[in-house]
Amino acid sequence: MKFLLTGGSGHLGANLVRRLLDDGKDVRVLLREGSNNAGLDGLDVERVFGDLRNPEALKAALRGVDRVYHCAAKLSTVDGGEQELFECNVIGTRNLLRAARDAGAGRVVVTGSFSAVGHRHDAPSDETVPFNPFDKAMPYEKSKAGVEHECLKAVVEGQDVVVATSCAILGPNDFKPSRMGRTLADFANGKMRAYIPGGFEFVAARDIVSGHLLAMEKGRTGQKYIISSRFTTVDELMEIFERVTGRRRPRLRLPPPVMAVIAEVTQAVQSTFFPSRPQRLTPGAVRILRMHRRADTTKAKTELGYQPTSIEDAVKEQYEFFIGQGWIDGKSPPLARKAPATEETKKRALA
């Protein structure tokens, strides 16, 4: 049985492809030319290149494929870029689902986002809470809601599609690295000057991988399943970082309203003068942390047999991975240092 995986070089994809290979699966990965694909270096996978926005490229990628994991997505917490997000995430998913159907592929598991689940103020959100596009939301959140709409349309047309909804991922094989990965590296290297209170749902890399495998094996067609390890406040996360790295958290704990203003100004300046530079703490990210959105994972546990593991273990694994890549100075950390990556790998991954 051949599996196609999109987004194989991302944080989720790099962990999922390794699990599939460990399980003896035949894996083909769809990659974009010119992207940072270091996460697949040295792996025994078939590589095909193409863009989700190009239906012809997808026809070739799906040829002979039995099952599909669609993990690729453009991520952004910036208030802008609506058209590109729509084309990459919504149109890209539509194209992939059609190509999979035309190729006769079986089940497609699509990675969803907890950002596209509605917010309850008085209780954790489950899969039944609808996303309200008229609420204040980032273009990325709206695009991921659009992705789920495309999945439902495909199901109505007879296609076997299941959505595995991801939260913020922590864990190893973070080659790019992710926003949370950069935060951990900054903390470990003593470069984090301040933080803000808040909280969000986090998922260990091994857990979100397990959730995708379970969705493929046991999920019901047309259903989505929220996969999270646990809700964690920023203060709790700082405590975990302290235990793992041996460093103290920053003394400066900024009030969220102050940070929201700073983020607005920073986004305006950076978008104008440094548009290619990644924006870390955006107004959208601050808003999400302030919401304290909690997830109800009962459905995944009941229907799939999903069992979450430890967030602290995930942070340890991510930290050890970064040491192995040479991205942490290692002066104070208590964990064993692995062989450093080459200078070429470091530059490519941090680009």
Residue ranges and their predicted role:
Residues 95, 146, 179, 196-216, ...:
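Substrate-positioning beta->alpha
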Residues 211-279, 297, 313-351:
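Mid/C-terminal beta-alpha module of Rossmann-like enzyme folds, strongest
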Residues 131-135, 182-203, 207, 219:
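A conserved pocket-lining segment of Rossmann-fold NAD(P)-dependent short-chain dehydrogenase/reductase
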Residues 83, 88-140:
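Conserved Rossmann-fold NAD(P)-dependent oxidoreductase catalytic core, especially the SDR/UDP-sugar
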Residues 205, 239, 266-271, 277-307:
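Conserved C-terminal active-site "lid" loop/helix of NAD(P)H-dependent oxidoreductases
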Residues 34-41, 45-91, 99:
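NAD(P)H-binding glycine-rich loop region in Rossmannoid oxidoreductase-like domains
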Residues 3-23:
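N-terminal Rossmann NAD(P)H-binding glycine-rich loop of SDR-like oxidoreductase domains
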Residues 112, 149-172:
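Conserved beta-loop-beta element that borders a ligand/cofactor-binding pocket
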